[in-house]
């Protein structure tokens, strides 16, 4: 099957969204509207065409990370999707290969994505950030702190202080935080803070799942959320000691990284290879975004 790989035009953006919704039907009820309006753009989309029809697409979203005392320009690879009837014809592989070549030429330091070791390892991706998973029953919560709905400005202040202890975290702006808050509102989720930490969460059958937690002291916030919602599940960067007697339930490989210009990626880090960088020897690695 001979495919044409190219960037889409603005007039093809709607078709890229249609491909996304077919491949990720769980997003079609609302998330994709938000994602295509606020998280991606036509210029980020690389697509595969067969006989003039868009059959697959990939989003390479700018993703600056804090590393080596500065900011390294990377991309987050998201939404790698192929229409079901065209799978197993190497469309995704051709998209990833073309994307890497283009980004390497642009001087992009690395590509980062949500893990799928069995697929992405073949393209040069290695594990980057790991998170420990925890469960906190409401009965084990501590002393609650007064909480409030957070703002983008407050989130950025907390995030900036929190990220100083890690390497590899996204260099976020207040606008980024506004976009995350908009996503939470659109999806009926919650964003709370006690001034020391913030949490983005959604309700579950048992309580709530916190999908982003940042802050040096999370005890008061977690206690208040457990009192409000019930049992909590949340994640912390690997080897972080939780501030409450939460039960560790496992670990998750949270992101993978592929060096595209390794000299740029490693500059001023002390590491000689990306594997060394990811090992944690030159700083604790943390990422919070899936895409």
PLM regions: where:
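Conserved beta-strand in the GNAT
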Residues: 47, 53-63, 74-81, 195-204, ...
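Active-site rim helix/loop that mediates acceptor-substrate recognition in acyltransferases
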Residues: 13, 21-67, 165-189
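Active-site/acyl-donor-binding loops of N-acyltransferases
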Residues: 126-142, 212-219, 223-291
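Conserved acetyl-CoA-binding loop-helix of GNAT-fold acetyltransferases
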Residues: 82, 88-101, 216-227
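Extreme N-terminal starter segment of soluble prokaryotic enzymes
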Residues: 2-5
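Conserved active-site tyrosine of GNAT-family acetyltransferases
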Residues: 120, 125
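Amide-forming acyltransferase catalytic core, primarily the GNAT-like/NAT-type
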Residues: 127-219
């Amino acid at each position: 099957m001979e495919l044409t790989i190219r960037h889409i035009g603005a007039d093809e953006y709607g078709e890229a969204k249609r491909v996304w919704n077919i491949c990720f039907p769980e997003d079609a009820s609302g998330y994709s509207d938000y994602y295509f309006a606020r998280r991606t753009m036509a210029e980020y989309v690389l697509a595969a065409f067969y006989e003039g029809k868009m059959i697959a697409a990939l989003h390479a979203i700018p993703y600056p990370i804090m590393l080596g005392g500065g900011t390294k320009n990377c991309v987050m690879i998201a939404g790698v999707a192929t229409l079901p009837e065209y799978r197993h014809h190497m469309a995704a592989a051709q998209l990833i290969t073309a994307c890497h070549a283009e980004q390497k030429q642009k001087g992009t330091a690395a590509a980062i994505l949500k893990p799928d070791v069995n697929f992405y390892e073949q393209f040069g991706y290695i594990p980057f950030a790991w998170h420990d998973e925890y469960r906190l029953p409401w009965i084990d919560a501590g002393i609650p702190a007064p909480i409030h709905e957070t703002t983008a400005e407050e989130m950025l202040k907390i995030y900036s202080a929190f990220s100083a202890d890690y390497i590899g975290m996204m260099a976020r702006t207040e606008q980024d935080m506004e976009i995350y808050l908009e996503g939470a509102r659109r999806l009926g989720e919650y964003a709370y803070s006690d001034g020391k930490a913030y949490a983005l969460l959604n309700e579950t059958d048992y309580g709530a799942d916190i999908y982003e937690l940042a802050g040096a002291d999370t005890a008061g916030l977690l206690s208040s959320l457990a009192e409000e919602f019930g049992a909590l599940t949340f994640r912390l960067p690997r080897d972080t000691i939780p501030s409450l007697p939460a039960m560790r339930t496992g670990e998750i490989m949270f992101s993978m990284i592929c060096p595209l210009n390794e000299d740029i990626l490693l500059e001023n880090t002390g590491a000689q290879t990306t594997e060394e960088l990811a090992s944690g020897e030159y700083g604790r690695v943390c990422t919070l975004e899936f895409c």
